Each structure stands twice: as C-alpha cells, then as structure tokens.
Amino acid sequence: SPVEGGPXGXL
C-alpha cells in the first residue's frame, strides 16, 4: 500500500 511506500508494499 502507499503507506508502506508504494503499491507493492508488504503490509
């Protein structure tokens, strides 16, 4: 998610 640093975030 964007909160994790992009659409490929782990969380």
Curated annotation (Swiss-Prot):
Stated name of the protein: 39 kDa cell wall protein
Source organism per UniProt: Solanum lycopersicum (Tomato)
Primary localization class, coarse: secreted
Record's keyword annotation contains Secreted: yes
Keywords: Cell wall, Secreted
One GO cellular component term: extracellular region
Subcellular location: Secreted, Cell wall
